[in-house]
Amino acid sequence: MPVQGSQRRLLGSLNSTPTATPKLGLAANQTGAWCLEVSIPDGLFLSLGLVSLVENVLVVAAIAKNRNLHSPMYCFICCLALSDLLVSGSNMLETAVILLLEAGALAARAAVVQQLDNVIDVITCSSMLSSLCFLGAIAVDRYISIFYALRYHSIVTLPRAQRVVAAIWVASVLFSTLFIAYYDHAAVLLCLVVFFLAMLVLMAVLYVHMLARACQHAQGIAQLHKRQRPAHQGFGLKGAATLTILLGIFFLCWGPFFLHLTLIVLCPQHPTCSCIFKNFNLFLALIICNAIIDPLIYAFRSQELRRTLKEVLLCSW
């Protein structure tokens, strides 16, 4: 839990590492006058977290309510929403505790605050890892549904999906605990960066392959109906735009955070890197924005889920 400036101590002391002058030997003016620090107000942090929290709670509630949505695909979507919910909730909790401590409204011993911070860090880190894993799992599920359509229901069964979900959660908690314990080791940070890049490559390869198959299918239909080529080109451009948006949002929201981790290893004392470190809160805000966008991309496009969501909202009133 931070007490130095406005930087949050997410993931152990990770974000305080760049600002800890004694450890890095950086003078306050070493970053230079050109350094741009984007300040994220606590109110904005809480607002983004609240929007994400409400969105993802609604997704989980809708999937839990409708038995027609109890399928492997929606199982992964539900777990993605739960991961995003935990990301937002843990950041909101940390921000609230920080504000209470700074205002003197919450009195606690340093040891208690440290333990609370460690718990929040583990929850945040494990939910981030699981969120990335479930994004990959959704991509794999969609890939199988397209390229192995006839065998899909025998390959992707609900018990298998549940085992995958359990494995992801266990692995996420285990590795996040190790990460918090050994956050100051370069190898640990590099492993996280490699994991992010692996998920990015996996999603890019699968979705590009799916787009290529969809374009071939559209071209075949166009030839059967003797349509002109521009119609097929229009479909390809639309699909490429959708793919660019999907992968672009993923990279834009997650990339800066993992760039932060990479620079901690490569250039912890360089003035330029130190300038980037000052925007850690911005990188966290982008991840929370991703938690807001995920339901719009993966959940709310489903007509069945939207119908169930209306029922949930009507019942709540």
From Swiss-Prot:
Source taxon at top rank: Eukaryota
Function (record text): Receptor for MSH (alpha, beta and gamma) and ACTH. The activity of this receptor is mediated by G proteins which activate adenylate cyclase. Mediates melanogenesis, the production of eumelanin (black/brown) and phaeomelanin (red/yellow), via regulation of cAMP signaling in melanocytes.
Spans through the membrane: 38-63, 73-93, 119-140, 164-183, 192-211, 241-266, 280-300
Lipidated residues (S-palmitoyl cysteine): 315
Annotated source species: Colobus guereza (Mantled guereza)
Protein name, UniProt field: Melanocyte-stimulating hormone receptor
Membrane topology: Multi-pass membrane protein
Subunit structure of this chain's protein: Interacts with MGRN1, but does not undergo MGRN1-mediated ubiquitination; this interaction competes with GNAS-binding and thus inhibits agonist-induced cAMP production. Interacts with OPN3; the interaction results in a decrease in MC1R-mediated cAMP signaling and ultimately a decrease in melanin production in melanocytes.
Sites where a glycan is attached: 29
Stored Gene3D superfamilies: Rhodopsin 7-helix transmembrane proteins
Keyword Transmembrane helix: yes
Cytoplasmic topological domain: 64-72, 141-163, 212-240, 301-317
UniProt lineage: Eukaryota, Metazoa, Chordata, Craniata, Vertebrata
CDD domains linked to this entry: 7tmA_MC1R (cd15351)
UniProtKB keywords: Cell membrane, G-protein coupled receptor, Glycoprotein, Lipoprotein, Membrane, Palmitate, Receptor, Transducer, Transmembrane, Transmembrane helix
InterPro entries: GPCR_Rhodpsn, GPCR_Rhodpsn_7TM, Melcrt_ACTH_rcpt, MSH_rcpt
Location in or out of the cell: Cell membrane
GO BP of this protein: adenylate cyclase-activating G protein-coupled receptor signaling pathway
Family the UniProt entry places it in: Belongs to the G-protein coupled receptor 1 family.
Entry annotated with the keyword Aminoacyl-tRNA synthetase: no
Predominant location: membrane
